[in-house]
């Protein structure tokens, strides 16, 4: 086994020979990261990515300046989907070490699950992985129900069934109930709804290769809310929360749904399909109907929903939408506390009417006359939230996955958003 490379932190600038803007230097003892107080966590994460790029796969975080957040920043940059890495962690107090261990267990689960090939992770596998993770941290405080295939159609989950019926792998709805009170009549505090499209070809509105090659990650919203619930439980969540994952493949076959099809939902809404690649909102609608029926204080849905959100924010921020200004402010405050990037985008009443159809109440995609695609997608979802003006947050997960490495991240999933949602649930 190779000897670990020591990584230490310093608030002193690097020797001038390393350059005026050097953020790290090397000596006989190892590598020194030079913190300047401006963005220390970002500096540590970027340095970790560089250290990994040097081929250094065994490190020891050394010295007294490391805390849980700094250790975590290092790991976020150091972790990558290929190869193995070993970190010898510094001595931390019990609370910080427990926090770090929980992040490593749960957020790494989120990243690894999103990175899994679609051949390995179908709708049923995603639902079962979610059950296993939550059960691991919640024990007997959790119950769940899995509904799949024709049972979905018979029970009226027409959006999820319609999207998923084109695949040989049956669509699946996971309904999970975390109830720490033990009282079956206890009110539900929050519902989390996740888009779990385990591969998205676009259907008959087929994607080009350049847009399809990362679509194993189209279940990023489901993984994120699952991780958020698990992480909130490790932080002492003592309120009842229900999780709904809407899992399916969106593929082409003789049984796949087609443009012009009309879906009738359990709340009476009829939706004309004019783009089979706008499938995420069709499956989320079923989950949001179930969530609304619980009468919770809070509904949060998360989905890799639109390219428009990525166009606006890149992969650097998650997009946040809500009619509830106070609740949006609470989410953004949680994001600030957890050092995770969220940005609120517009959502107004008029966005709800920008999905006209000649044959149904709603179209599943906006026309060229209404180009605000991320906002109209959120407007579409609002039609399936009973009290959409209060207590509902929609997260378009544009920061979930990176197709190529950048200075802070390897290629693949980031795990961003888990801590923010967990923070809000436990605030």
From Swiss-Prot:
InterPro entries (alphabetical): Leucine_aapep/pepB, M17_PepB-like_N, Pept_M17_PepB, Peptidase_M17_C
Residues that, per the record, bind Mn(2+) 2: 195, 200, 218, 279
Broad enzyme group: hydrolase
Keyword terms, alphabetized: Aminopeptidase, Cytoplasm, Hydrolase, Manganese, Metal-binding, Protease
Reaction(s) this enzyme catalyzes, per UniProt: Release of an N-terminal amino acid, Xaa, from a peptide or arylamide. Xaa is preferably Glu or Asp but may be other amino acids, including Leu, Met, His, Cys and Gln
Predominant place of localization: cytoplasm
Cell membrane among keywords: no
Record EC number: 3.4.11.23
GO CC entries: cytoplasm
Required co-factors: Mn(2+)
Places the protein is found: Cytoplasm
GO biological process, one term: proteolysis
Binding site for Mn(2+) 1: 200, 277, 279
Active-site residues, as the UniProt record annotates them: 207, 281
GO MF term list: manganese ion binding; metalloaminopeptidase activity
Quaternary assembly: Homohexamer.
Role according to the record: Probably plays an important role in intracellular peptide degradation.
Entry similarity comment: Belongs to the peptidase M17 family.
NCBIfam families: PRK05015.1
Protein name: Peptidase B
Native organism: Shigella dysenteriae serotype 1 (strain Sd197)
Protein's gene: pepB
